[in-house]
Amino acid sequence: MTTIDLNCDLGESFGAYKMGNDDEILPFVSSINVACGFHAGDPSIMRQTVEKALEHNVAIGAHPGFPDLIGFGRRNMNVSASEVYDYVLYQTGALDAFVKAAGGKMQHVKPHGALYNMAASNPEIADAIAKAIYHINPSLLLYGLANSEAFIQAAEKYKVTLVQEAFADRTYKQDGTLTSRTEENALIKDEDEAIKQVLQMVKEGYVNSVNGEKVAVQAQTICLHGDGEKAVQFAERIYRTFKLNGISICAPK
């Protein structure tokens, strides 16, 4: 039986500001990435999100990003590899403390937004992320963009297990990278098209690029976005579609 992980970014609320549909989406995913306070989230939200995830028996990962609350961590920053190492170490360590305090065990680290995209094409950034993970806990998994040589090489260097990730509602360029969110066609807004793309990636191992060419994608985890108007409906559709197609949903080991 084919097995796939469904992951979602949660814990993105901040103080009085609510983001996402965390409670409603948790039943349909197998792992979550928790914002750690730099691009979103705060200590109370981190604790609450961890506790809810443990109640649902969902795997927990840190979602470190750039220190850019206003830009939600989606803007590139001119930072050194040393700074990236510090950012990841700081945020991941903070979430790990909350997970341990709640009696759980953290499973993975997935960089957020611009940090993720920069790491996918910048070996120095990817190296700094993998190095931080190695120094915190070498058994932590690294979630990174499928086919990214930067992620692959960094994971191999530090002997960190890489979980290659694909996106349900994002379009892909010919080189296998994601279409930038600054482009109008970055997101797939038609649910049926997104479902078709996900099944194609999981069952057949490829995705159609924006140019119409087939791009090989061997994904072990699929990212769902939890902050859209129909995010919960979409998550439930993917969950049920996988079940109907004999695809088992399970966090990576």
UniProtKB/Swiss-Prot annotation:
Disulfide bonds: none annotated. Signal peptide: none annotated. It catalyses: 5-oxo-L-proline + ATP + 2 H2O = L-glutamate + ADP + phosphate + H(+). Its EC number is 3.5.2.9. InterPro entries: Glyco_hydro/deAcase_b/a-brl, LamB/YcsF/PxpA-like. Keywords: ATP-binding, Hydrolase, Nucleotide-binding. Pfam families: LamB_YcsF. The keyword Hydrolase applies. One of its GO terms (molecular function) is ATP binding. One of its GO terms (biological process) is carbohydrate metabolic process. Forms a complex composed of PxpA, PxpB and PxpC. Belongs to the LamB/PxpA family. Catalyzes the cleavage of 5-oxoproline to form L-glutamate coupled to the hydrolysis of ATP to ADP and inorganic phosphate. This is 5-oxoprolinase subunit A.
